[in-house]
Amino acid sequence: MGADHTAGYAVATNIMKVGGDVDPLKSEGQVALSRDLQVTTAAVDSTGMCLFIAFAVMDQADTFQALLDLITAFSGAPCTADDVANLGKSVLRNERDFNMRAGMTNKDDRLPAYMLKEKLAPHNIVFEVTDEELDQVHNY
């Protein structure tokens, strides 16, 4: 909840190509990538597992199945990929609801203005995701 360097850890996909391939220098695909990674991270965190397993889980079907088997063994109920996604979405909805009740709004999801204006070397780009696109991160 709040700023978290591990939630929506797009570096994994943008740079290391784990779980897909999205160009880190373009805005296209970043919102969906962030949303999906936040869902995954919330689910993995809820199991008590460290985020580091996410890299293996995203790229190796056998490892993902091992996570499902572990959750099934722990809970006593069969666990599917949809169940894991729904767990992550539920966590994020609860966090979002808490924040909204605490008085936060979409304006609190915005990055500092300088990130929209000051070019970052060595690629000389700025954050180009619009507010409207950014608001879509919370559409699970």
Please tell me what each predicted stretch does:
Residues M1-Y140:
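Extended C-terminal regions of large enzymes
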